[in-house]
């Protein structure tokens, strides 16, 4: 190999972090915010929908489950597709799918139609999450990657806050259909903007297109006001065929199984609580307006959780941050269950929200770093798929929380234990990825 050639990571270090990555983070982040709105809208609208259509507890659980079934299929399909034909197709298509079907949901004539449309909305959302993380991670220098991947997750909190705020303003005055319609508009706008982002240069290089990869890197350098050295990119030999079964091959099996455990448990705990949160408050005797006010307060607590995790993943490392935040999530979920007044429920809920969403951010930072380029999208898609399985289970399990009003100790204890199991899994991860370059092949890990 020519001694004057440079690796992809050396090239990324040369172009640096600047306007291009900031623009990409905002574009990815706004898509994430739009997706967060779509995922949690039904939980915010559920009391109003149930009242209008007279839904049973089982029907409410099915409606909450629908989007996660779509997200499971979407995560597996789009994650795999992004490793085969590139990140760009899924990056653009997924946000269009979830926004179009999200808008159509506002016009659902019946319960069955609403379930079907929310499932299709989930198919788009399920692809956006893993594809966005893969493409953004592949544009980042190693020393900034963890912090900015967690900050990207902060946009999810902005979406939750926006959804809670819109529900507070719209549902009591105009009804749930207007909430669904208004919330779909941002995604349609973001779809148009996303088309200008080029394909991942790392993907291009791994797939034998060094000229195209260099052209993209030169674009990044010009945007950032830097210069790419006049040296050829060192080819990356793909020695690991892309395929889901490769995630369980020796060298990756332990990491994959532990990551799947964490994704499953954090999703079960998070959606088990938050899908039903407005309904929990309603069951305590709150009127509709205070329900949305308290939900909005808990949503606000997510932002500082993300920002603290963004700092600690670089200061402490990915693994200890994950373990601490997941364990703390479990502790405060139990205290949330044991609280005997609305004020204490809200106070413990704030800390639960803080730590849970910080854990999400750290997990999204670690997972794409755990896999080589040829498997990164597939790995993210498979891991994300486990959240869709537990997310689909959580609403039905959460239906039990409505029995007996605020007597929520047993089911919420299950969710608390789920978080703690995830924290234990984090301690078993074999690799710390802080400040390390992304691997392109399994042999390079």
Predicted segments, located by residue:
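Transmembrane-helix signature of 12-pass secondary carriers
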Residues: 1-445
